[in-house]
Structure formats: structure tokens, C-alpha cells
Amino acid sequence: MGKKDKNKKGGQDSAAAPQPQQQQKQQQQRQQQPQQLQQPQQLQQPQQLQQPQQQQQQQPHQQQQQSSRQQPSTSSGGSRASGFQQGGQQQKSQDAEGWTAQKKQGKQQVQGWTKQGQQGGHQQGRQGQDGGYQQRPPGQQQGGHQQGRQGQEGGYQQRPPGQQQGGHQQGRQGQEGGYQQRPSGQQQGGHQQGRQGQEGGYQQRPPGQQQGGHQQGRQGQEGGYQQRPSGQQQGGHQQGRQGQEGGYQQRPPGQQQGGHQQGRQGQEGGYQQRPPGQQQGGHEQGRQGQEGGYQQRPSGQQQGGHQQGRQGQEGGYQQRPSGQQQGGHQQGRQGQEGGYQQRPSGQQQGGHQQGRQGQEGGYQQRPPGQQPNQTQSQGQYQSRGPPQQQQAAPLPLPPQPAGSIKRGTIGKPGQVGINYLDLDLSKMPSVAYHYDVKIMPERPKKFYRQAFEQFRVDQLGGAVLAYDGKASCYSVDKLPLNSQNPEVTVTDRNGRTLRYTIEIKETGDSTIDLKSLTTYMNDRIFDKPMRAMQCVEVVLASPCHNKAIRVGRSFFKMSDPNNRHELDDGYEALVGLYQAFMLGDRPFLNVDISHKSFPISMPMIEYLERFSLKAKINNTTNLDYSRRFLEPFLRGINVVYTPPQSFQSAPRVYRVNGLSRAPASSETFEHDGKKVTIASYFHSRNYPLKFPQLHCLNVGSSIKSILLPIELCSIEEGQALNRKDGATQVANMIKYAATSTNVRKRKIMNLLQYFQHNLDPTISRFGIRIANDFIVVSTRVLSPPQVEYHSKRFTMVKNGSWRMDGMKFLEPKPKAHKCAVLYCDPRSGRKMNYTQLNDFGNLIISQGKAVNISLDSDVTYRPFTDDERSLDTIFADLKRSQHDLAIVIIPQFRISYDTIKQKAELQHGILTQCIKQFTVERKCNNQTIGNILLKINSKLNGINHKIKDDPRLPMMKNTMYIGADVTHPSPDQREIPSVVGVAASHDPYGASYNMQYRLQRGALEEIEDMFSITLEHLRVYKEYRNAYPDHIIYYRDGVSDGQFPKIKNEELRCIKQACDKVGCKPKICCVIVVKRHHTRFFPSGDVTTSNKFNNVDPGTVVDRTIVHPNEMQFFMVSHQAIQGTAKPTRYNVIENTGNLDIDLLQQLTYNLCHMFPRCNRSVSYPAPAYLAHLVAARGRVYLTGTNRFLDLKKEYAKRTIVPEFMKKNPMYFV
């Protein structure tokens, strides 16, 4: 029997010494290793991984082991760049052009993630503070010692598949864990050890065979990803410990015989799992700490033991599914606030498997393996069994298990509340039934729900159903559909009777597998169970329909007439509850508040007096002068027409199409063969109009007019209009909706209390329970970059902003630019003060010199009149005199911004910078001038600033960043096309961009002409850089979740085809930027003077628990919200051919949020996507003045930007 080892000071773990026969064999293998490493042909034959060969090797007798002590690493400090250290030496080598890890020892070289072998000997690596990528390629390691240590800011440490015989493997993960994995392979009779430090990066030991050697890896403070592949372990010790902020610890499938497997996860983990396998002869124990939430042990066979579970204070959910448990001991303890601890089905016979998860446990997993006849404690182990055959070549890496997407690890750890409620689906039936509902007539649809409810009670025996209000309903019981009386009668609020015919029938595939929601979570299949999700979504909306007005997924509660919040022009703001069924690591209900403007219900006469005329109506009031502003409000609105009592008819609802051409006293129509005026007609019916001089409302069609007197109409209550709000409405709505996170949460909780989901019979019948408070998840706060200006001067970013403080722009253009200031000199009305105008010009010149912009001090001042032709004359003169810039001061009325941009950029090719006259007259201060100069320098093809070089991001200098966005017309502009905007960088810093825009069919999401757009961007990149990019990072904005496949199959295909056409093969990473969602972060604490809205810090990342378990996805708040609750941006990575590490991608994305040229603040999403939005907005400016677009190609040709202007000033659109 092996002796117990004593631990050394300094945190070293014990290891059993090999037998003399083993030591002799190991010494021979160490002598052979240099020769084996000098076989470059192995690098060229990755196929060997797919063609394993068998070789006979005898396992040493392991019952005669002697204790030995593990030697500490002799390297001190750490290397700054990622590299490889072997044989006690440090070797630093990394390709500076990104995503390529290179290793040289002797004549062996590894490039571009190629893994190769190592046989025997001693392998040691230590990575320093900012380490990036440390890799030890696969090979055969027989009877040696492998050790790796990663330093403070870890990154990526990897030991690929090989054969390791008779060693020691141990894994310890520190405070901010991340990801610890042991994939498949054969490990016999040894000890494997790895230690990951505080914020661990990525440490990996892929599959191989280990017999009687020693392998040790230690990762330092900010590591992140530690992996040890699975294998066959006979008589060894495998141990993993994860520290405070756990993350993800995994041991995949393999055969483990006669050893000890132990895992401990620390404070902030979240998900601990041991998948199905065969474990013989032992003890399995799991403990989850304070903030667990969900502890599960699925079905399996456990022989010889005890199963025990304890749930703590705020436990949440603890489950042990059916299985056979005979003997053995399985124990799980869940702490104060739940989490998720799972041990899937398997066979456990004897053996000892232990896992402990700390306060907020992350993710600890031990996949299926075999552990027979094993009993030992930490530091002591035995092996029994006959020697086994070994394979000469390592087995191929197994496919990554579903749901094991690598998550980020770097950053300062923390916690935050998320507006997600846990859903308990444990009592949900296994199936539901889907039925098609057909209701005739099709209009009015707003009474469908009332008619269906009557049908449910009368014809379906009051069956509990979930109806979506349109064409589907769901039930957990089969419905009796044979005998139906399809006709029902309903009465509206005005007493009008409506008859509907309802038909219900089963769909083609009526049965819905509701258990697929559980299967999705447990088995981690990659396809969402969409039908089951749709069913649950309809069920969860059931309690809201009768209490609120539904708009999309939001339910708006009617306002109190005595306490309404009025916006402008007759609108009020209503607050509604948004809810959506979500699948992350478990089912959630996403809840948030929504704000929407609704027309205020009031008589039309009151509306005219308060908002349109803003005066009392009398006998002389005329609507001709107000018609231009009144009709846009009236068109499409519903009014209730209340006939006079003498008509003896019920009120009716009509939709307004506009105003009549003439007042009621003059407008005529045919009645009894005569033409009569509307006023005389009502007078003949004993109702003389009070205001016959007012126009009537036209509620008929274009063919047949129906005219109603305004004084008999009122605006219908609760209308959700699908129209664009005016500028004043938007400004007032933002002020009203901008609240702190504390106030926002209080509003959400009040609405949840109002709707009472858990008391709804439909939700109860489907076996769903909803939690009462937000979930709490782990976060990481990324470090902000340093911003670099001219002469290598740097400034720190604090709370999402920074100051220049005397610094100069990084790269201004040295030429003295000729500048002109244009101002409006109307023929009549107020004129600009020339002194203010001159002061403004002098400030532009003086402050421009201070930041290194060279503007000619001889400024030209030119007035223009109300006539647009005067602008044409001035622009033509400036073009002839070779002026570089025209600063145009825009009056509040008369000449518009759109007109100026169209003339300057489409006709004359003049660079313009517009500023409002009000700003020049009232706000002309240093800050305003500084912000204008930021735009001017970028437009003149200068670079304001860049991010300080980061050794972890070497690929930045040969990367083209592409941002794309598609803006669509508002719903009331159906004939206006969509505008595509694509911006692409062409400099080493990601600071200078060129643009392309296109017109395409309205509401078309994918970009049709991406091939030619990419070709043009590649041409410009080659022109500036004399080479094509090695990497393309594509940030795509404005895409809904359902459009992801189209983007990947169409837009990315076009990008690749364009690259093929010019003969380059860049690695492509495509990131979808999603802003339209309702996920919000709610930190604890109260409002402070420095954080008056109580938002999270810029750089806060969430990439666990609430994200899709099978996709590379993360949320990030990259900005400091000026007002209201900060909205995180969601990023979905749908293509990553270069295998860009998630930590690097998150830091790179955060850095790019500091590269927006318009301001010295970080913005809410990366600069490429933001600039693409500006491109699309500029394309929409070019459409102003045209209402019909019959031929988009011809219309686009009319709006071609002057080519030489675009070449000289590629960032003119900023």
C-alpha cells in the first residue's frame, strides 16, 4: 500500500513516488524526449489523431509506491506575453497577428492552434501577469512530470491530448474559477494536478493515456479556463477545487477505476453537475452554498449507499428524480439561496465521488466514467487490476458536450439582480394540446377574446384554455369537439350586438411535448423547443388580458383620469408590464416596464380647444389654418360617434381618414334626391349644430365619404396607435420614463401585484409557479482601456468618460484647411447678431489649434437666404475656391438639415458641419466647441484618439472591423424603402472608417447587396494598408433572434465570396448586436450623488445563467447612462472561424465602445455598429422630399455621393 504524503508549506500538494522500476523507465523516457520533439513530420500529420495505434505497455505494480514530494516551480515572476515553458525553462513566442499560438523547442513549431505531441520527460510552463495563450501540444507523455503555472491575468493555458502514464493529476481553481474540464482519455495509476488561481483563465489537458507519471498545472490569479481530459484512471487521485466565483468546472466522460475524485466549488458558482456514468464502490457528495436555487440528481443506479439532500434558507428547488439506489452514499446540500446542482443518471457502486460548491456555486461537472473498487482519502491512493494495453496515438478529441460553451473569466467579480423570475415547471403536465381557432367575421378583432370566452363557457363546458386572442388555443385536456353550436353573441360597451361564428379543430400535430422544456435544460439539445415555448408564453399572458390593453408582449394598465401623465398634442403616457418566457440555464419569466403614448380619451371639441387651437371655439373659429397640423393626428384614430337623442340609435366607433373639404355649413350630400348641407340635415332631425362652421370628420373610404360633425365625436379610450411619436412627445416620454433602477423595480413589482399571476386558474392548471423576486447572478466588471492621444500621452477612463486636459488629437491633418461659416440672413424676420457670429468663428479657430486642428484663420462668412437656390450658389463658389469645410448655422425654420446635406454631398461635394442657430446664440461655450471639433477632425480624415496597445489583443492591427445596420421606415410610411448602412475600418486602430449605403425593399432584414459592399470595403482597405485584412470582425446591428440563420447563410456567405474574389482568406467573427430587449441590471444599494440612477459600472458583463446555454452569448453595459436605467447590449456570436477566445472578444468589444469619434465617453455598443447606424441615418436623409419609390435602382442612382468627395473625406457622415 502507498504511504500517506505530507503536504509541503506554500500550498504544494502531495504526490506518491513511483516505484524503482517506474523511475528507471521514466529516466529512459526523459532521455528519449528531445529526439521525439525533433520530428517535424508529426506537425504535418494531424490525421494521426484520427488513426490511433495500439501498443503493449505494462503497468507498474502500484501497491509498492513510496512517498515523494512535489518540487516547486523554479521560475520566478512571469512573462508578459503568452508563450510556452518546457523542461524548467521559459520560452516566449506568440504570433503578433492574432489568434495564432506559436511554440518553438528544438525544431518543433506549432502554428494556428495545431497541437502536437510530447513524450516522457518534464514539461513546465508559467505564464505571467497579462498572459494570453499558453499551449502544450498533444503527444505521448510516459512517466514524466508536466507542470504549468499561469499568472495573474491568465488567458489560455492548454495541454492537448497525449499519453501520460503513472502520474499525478490534480486541479484546483481559485477565486474566480471559470472552466475546469477533464475530457476523455485513459489515465491509469497516476496523479494529475492543476491549480488555477484567483481569476483563472484557461487551462486544459486533453485526452490521453497517463500511466505512472506526474502532471501538474497551476494557474494564477486571473486565469479562467482549466481543463483536464477524461481518461481511464486506475489507482490514482483526481481532485478539482474551484474557488470563490466558480464558473464552470467539468470532468467529461471516461473510465476511472479505484481512485478518488473530488471537486469543490467556491463562493459564486451557480451550476454544479455530475453527468451519468458508472461509479463503483464509493461516496458521492455535493454541497451547494448560499445562493444556489436549483439542486437536482437525475435518475440512475446507485448501489450500496445513502442519498441525502438538504435545502437551506431560500432554497428554491431541490429535486432527485427516479433511479435505483443500492448501498453507496450520495449526499447534496443546498445553501441559503439555491442555485443549481445536478447529478445525472449513472451507476454508482462503491467508489467515492465528492463535490462541494460554495456560496454561489458556478458549474461543476463530472461526466460518466467507471470507478471500481476504490477507497482512499486526499493524498493517498491505491490501484488494483491487471495491466492494460495502451494505444500508441491519442484518441481524437470528443465533441464538446452540449451546453459547455466557454464563458469569460477576466474582470472584477460581483453580483447583480436581473429582472428575471424563476419558473417552477416541476408540476407541469407532460403534454398539452394545440387547437386552431377560426372566428368569422374577421372584423372587428377586438371582440375575439370576448366571443371566445363565451364559446368556452357555453360549448366547451368551461374547460380551462389558454387563448392567444387570434387563431390558437392550448389545453392540457382533450376538448370535446364533436357537438358544437358555433354561433355566439357579444355586446360591446355601447350596447351594440355582434354575432360571431367560432370553429375549433385540432392542428396537424396537436400534441405538444411540454417535457421538452425540461429535456432542453438537462440534455442541452441545441434546438429550442419552440412549440412548447409558444404554449407557455400564451399561458403566462392569461391573467393580463382582462385587466389591460395588450400591445405586443406588453400589457398597459389604464390610467386614472385624475392622475394621468400627459405628454403633448393630446397624448398620455401609460405604463405597462412587459413579460416574455425565456430559457437560460433554467426557465425564466423576463418582466419589465414599458411606456407607450396613447391618445387621451376626450370629446373632439375639447381636443381642439386644448391642443390644436389652444383657444375657445366660437362662431368665427375656422379649421383651415390648423388643418396641416390637425390631420396627421386624426388620420387613423378611432372616434366614438354619439348620435343625438332624436336619432334614437346607439353610438358607433369609426376610424377617421381626415377632415372634410368644407365646413358642415357648406359640405353637401345627396338626401332624398336633393343636395343638402350637413348642418341643415341635422337641423331637420331636430338637432341644430352648435358649431356648423367647423369641418366634419371623414370616416368613410376614398370611394364613399361618411362625414360626421366634430361636436358629436369623441376619441375612443385605450387606442394603441402604430405610429411614430413626434419630437416633443419623445422628449417628454424620455423624461417620464428615465427613473433609477430602484424606482423601476418598484413599478415592476406593483404591476406584478396587480396582475396576480400565481392566482390565475389557467397558469395553475398548467402546473406553473412563478417566483416573487428577481434572480441574482454573478457579474464581471472589465477594466477600461487607456486612451492614447498625440505624443504618446495617455488618459484614464473613469465611470465611462475621460478628459483630454490639454492633450491633442492623435493624428490631425497637417494641412491648413480653408473654412467658411454660412449663416441664414432671411429677407424678413430676426437676423443673426454679427458679433456672436464672429465670436463663434474665432472660438472654432483658437480651440482647433489647441487640439492640433489646423484651420485657416482667414474665415469666410457667407449669408444665405430662405431660397434654397442661394445655397447652390454658395456651395458652387466654395468648391471653386477649394474650401475644405463649410460650417452651416441652421435656423429653426426655413432651410432644413436634410436639404443642406443633399445639396452638399450629392450635388457639390462640399464637406459640411451643421450647428443650430440656437446653440450658437445661447450655448456657445468651450464644451460645445470641443464637441464640434471632435466631429470636424474626423470628417477631415484625422484620428481623435486610439486605445493603448494591449498585448492580449495583438490582432487589432491587421483586422477590419465592419458594422452594419438596416433602418426601416415607420409603420405609417409603407412606401418608403429600408436603408442599409455599412461602415468598415481601414486603419490599424479601428478609428477611421469608410461607408457604403444602399436602398432595398421595406422591412427586408438581411442585406441584399452585401457582396458588392464588401468588395468596395476590401478595395479601400487595400488602398490604405497595401494588404488585405487577416481578420474580419463583423458587428451586425438591427437583427431579431429569428433572423440569425439568414444573416449567417446569406450575409456571411457574401462576405466570404467577396474575400475569395480578391484572393484573401481572413478569419471571420460575426457578432450580432441586440439592443431591443428587456433585460436590465438592478444592483443593490441606493442612489448616490455620483450614481444618481443606481446603475452598474461600465464594463459589467453577464454571460452565465440567463444566456443561451448552447451559444456564445453575453450581456454588457459599456456606458454610464446619462439618465434612467442603463440598458445592457446583448451580443450573440454566430460565426467564429478564428476561434477568438471569449475573454478577448469581450475585452475587444468593450474597447471598441471607447472608439466612437463624436464624444469622449464610452457608448452603449461598439463604434463599428454605431457608425453603421449613422450611415443608414444619412441614407435616410437623402430620401427626404420623395414619397414614392417605384424603381429603387434608379432612385439610388439619383442619390450617388460625389465620388472624389467620398474618397477625400471617407468619414464625412460622422
UniProtKB/Swiss-Prot annotation:
Primary localization: nucleus
Gene3D superfamilies found in the cross-reference section: 3.40.50.2300, paz domain (2.170.260.10), Ribonuclease H-like superfamily/Ribonuclease H (3.30.420.10)
Domain Piwi: start-end pairs: 885-1186
Residue sites binding a divalent metal cation per the record: D965, D1037, H1173
Keywords: Cytoplasm, Host-virus interaction, Magnesium, Manganese, Metal-binding, Nucleus, RNA-binding, RNA-mediated gene silencing
Domain PAZ: 608-717
PROSITE patterns recorded: PAZ, PIWI
Impact upon substituting S714R: In strain: 186
Effect of mutating T835A: In strain: 128, 130, 138, 140, 141, 186, 187 and 196
Record note on what altering S740P does: In strain: 130
Effect of D866E: In strain: 128, 130, 141, 186 and 187
Cofactor(s) essential for the protein: Mg(2+); Mn(2+)
Gene Ontology BP term (one): miRNA-mediated post-transcriptional gene silencing
Compartments, record wording: Nucleus; Cytoplasm, Cytoplasmic ribonucleoprotein granule
A GO CC term attached to the entry: cytoplasm
InterPro entries: ArgoL1, ArgoL2, Argonaute_Mid_dom, Argonaute_N, PAZ_dom, PAZ_dom_sf, Piwi, Piwi_ago-like
SUPFAM superfamilies assigned: PAZ domain, Ribonuclease H-like
Binding partners and assembly: Interacts with Fmr1, Dcr-1 and vig to form the RNA-induced silencing complex (RISC), a ribonucleoprotein (RNP) complex involved in translation regulation, other components of the complex are RpL5, RpL11 and Rm62. As part of the RISC complex, interacts with Tudor-SN. Interacts with Taf11. (Microbial infection) Interacts with cricket paralysis virus protein 1A; this interaction may block the RISC activity.
Domain notes per entry: PAZ domain provides a major contribution for nucleic acid recognition. PAZ binds oligonucleotides of different lengths and has a strong preference for single-stranded nucleic acids (ssRNA or SSDNA) or RNA duplexes with single-stranded 3' overhangs. Can bind the characteristic two-base 3' overhangs of siRNAs, indicating that it may contribute to the specific and productive incorporation of siRNAs and miRNAs into the RNAi pathway.
Function: Essential for RNA interference (RNAi); double-stranded RNA induces potent and specific gene silencing. RNAi is mediated by the RNA-induced silencing complex (RISC), a sequence-specific, multicomponent nuclease that destroys or silences messenger RNAs homologous to the silencing trigger.
Protein name as annotated: Protein argonaute-2
Higher taxonomy: Eukaryota, Metazoa, Ecdysozoa, Arthropoda, Hexapoda
Gene name as annotated: AGO2
